[in-house]
Each structure stands twice: as C-alpha cells, then as structure tokens.
Amino acid sequence: MKPVGEADVKGYNTWDTSAPIDASTPDVGTRGEPSLDAIVALHPDLVVTTTDLPENVIKQIAKKVPVLALRGSDGSDPIGYMRRTVTTLAKATGTEAKGTQVLADFDAKVDAAKADLEKAGKTGAPFTMADGWIDNGTVSVRMYTPGSFLGGIAEELGLKNQWTTGGDKDYGLATTDVEGLTKITDADTTFLYAASDDDGGDPFAVGLKDNKVWKQLPFVSAGNVKRIPDGIWMFGGPLSAERYVDAVVDALS
C-alpha cells in the first residue's frame, strides 16, 4: 500500500531500504514536527503515527483527519508487539490476508536461519548489537538489549545477548561509552553494529580506530566486529526483520 504522504522521506529512505518509499512521495515534515497543513492538504483516509509524537500534536491532527496512534515498540515483548502491530495495520487498511502472509514469511525466515546457524555451530552464540554517534570527538554507544527490536529477533534465532541491562521500556535501548564496553568479556562475542555512510558515518571504524580501550577489547582483538548492511531499519517491521536475520547469519557463519 503506497502512502499519499510521509514524514522525512529522505531520512526514511536513508535508514530503511527494506521497504523503500517512492522519493517523489510528498514530505509532510519531520517525524517530531509534522506539518498539519501539509497532512490535511493530502486528504488522507488515515494518518498512522506513534505515541512518540507529542499528545497535543496528535490531537491537532485528529481534529482534521482520522488518526491511528500506536506505541513505537514494547520492551517487554518486542517481537510479539511487532506481530500485533502488523495485524492492527492490516485490519485498519483492509489488507488482512497480506498481513498474515507477511508474518508467515517472517516465521519461515527465522526457521531457516536457525537451521543455518545450527549447521555453522552457532546456536546459542554470544553477540551484541549496537549503533553510535560522534559528538565533539566523543563516541557514544547505544546498545540493543533483549527488549529491543533487533535484540528480540536475535533471541528468536537462539543467540545470547551479552548486553541485557539498562534498556528503556519502549525500545529496549541502553546508552554507554567505549569504557562501558569492557563489560563484554567473552572474546567469542560477535559485536554487530549499524551505521550509515549517508547520515553520521561510521563511529566505530572511524571514531574508535585509534582508541586504545576499543582496540584492547577481547571481541575487537579477536576480529569479531561486524557492521550490518546499510538500510536495515532498527525499529522496523517484518521486512526489516528478515534483512536483519540474513545479516546476522552472514556475520556469524
């Protein structure tokens, strides 16, 4: 189903190539500050947003057009919540059969990946997932706990997340720095991370290349740092999940 409008079309297509939006799709502003006038001008049947958008903004939009506001994720059950969200959106758009098929495809992908990991001797393998950014020369690191979308997918694959604490209640994300990574002591841990050459660059390969603490981390010394392909949205749905599954299998096997 093609949207009549989208917030931050360019940014979306930078970070999510699993389900790209037509670049000519009308842009209605940023995700945090959408333009009410731009939205209304498109005469949408339904506006879908997350409850991350301020409540007063959602109410303003709802005065003009129907709005479906969904929680971005649920740190207590990220994959279950993804499933429920797909079902909710399918019902709202009259595409129930498609929604069922999308979830079935995801399940099949997970089953195949678990078999591939077993063949590679990687069932239950230790891993972490991260992204990061550079601010005034300092690298901040965001860790994906089991309550995160990507952490939940890896758990479905039977992998063992080595960063289990500090996640927020919605997205399961925890923030640390390079010194904090010293808590990861198992050299067999695969340190997966996301970055974008088009938005922020690579804080690990570039920002930490000369950092002594980073270079002495067991998993770094062992060569177990793997960047996942660009364009896998870290807070997405089944299509992003399937691409992440492929990325994990490739990285570990």
Where is each model-derived feature located?
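A short, structured surface patch at a secondary-structure boundary
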Residues: 1-38, 51
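Hydrophobic beta-strand scaffold residues
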Residues: 3, 67-68, 161
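Alpha-helical, coiled-coil/dimerization segments enriched in small aliphatic residues
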Residues: 10, 140-173
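Extracytoplasmic ligand-binding site segments that recognize negatively charged/polar headgroups
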Residues: 11-14, 54-56, 72-88, 122-152, ...
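Short helix-initiation/N-cap motifs at beta->coil->alpha
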Residues: 28-36, 168-178
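Proline-aspartate-enriched helix->loop->beta-strand connector
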Residues: 43-49, 181, 186-190
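Extracytoplasmic substrate-binding proteins
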Residues: 66-136, 231, 235, 239-253
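Structured C-terminal subdomain patch of bacterial secreted/periplasmic proteins
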Residues: 185-253
